[in-house]
Amino acid sequence: MEEIKIGVVGLGYVGLPLARLFATKYAVVGFDLKKERIEALNRGIDRTLEVSEEVMKSVLRPSVPKRGEKGLYCSCDPEDLRDCNYYIITVPTPVDKHNRPDLTPLIRASETVGQVIVRGDIVIYESTVYPGATEEDCIPVIERVSGLKYNVDFFAGYSPERINPGDKQHTVEKIKKVTSGSTPGVAEKVNALYHSVIVAGTHLAPSIRVAEAAKVCLLYT
């Protein structure tokens, strides 16, 4: 059986609750560029108030957990991500004054993952994007940085985040997740990963593009 280790890139209101949830079952490394944020999180303090100090401390580990272990270690050092075999990117996608999406955070997060990814790894995007962005804008960045080939050496998934910040009733595990993967086998793996922690269940979309479109539809309904 595959031993799973997850790297969550971006520890904001989406990434942190997700990292905390996965850490109840798996080894998780939470990565964020903000050093002050990482230092606070490793003391159990989430200034966004999405995760309580008690809950944070219940999953925190003093060092990077190994595959097969459980728990969360937060870091701003990309090297701490190196042993992960699943990467979940949860960085924001702001819009400019013309309401066009700014993919800069996603591109930078993809570069970070590209530095540490190895053959067989799976990269899952949760950030809100337009249909096609994952495979047309983000994946080529990973290929360029890593030297690996998409759907040959590494694979991808998309599962749109649906967290409502500040909502203590509809927390991440209580919201049904749409999942997808770049091949049928990878799609099943991605779906199984989320299904193992999401009590509300999952829905496996037929493709990454369909899953991306599902999030766009949710924004306008």
Residue ranges: model-predicted function:
Residues 2-4, 27, 33-86, 92-100, ...:
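Conserved N-terminal Rossmann-fold NAD(P) cofactor-binding segment
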Residues 89, 155, 162-205:
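Dinucleotide-binding Rossmann-like beta1-alpha1 core, especially the glycine-rich loop
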Residues 15-16:
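N-terminal Rossmann-fold NAD(P) dinucleotide-binding loop
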Residues 22:
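Aromatic pocket-lining residues of Rossmann-like dinucleotide-binding sites
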Residues 220-221:
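Conserved small/polar residues in nucleotide/adenosyl-binding loops
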Residues 95-162:
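Rossmann-like NAD(P)(H) cofactor-binding subdomain of soluble oxidoreductases
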Residues 11:
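Glycine-rich Rossmann-fold phosphate-binding loop(s) that bind the pyrophosphate
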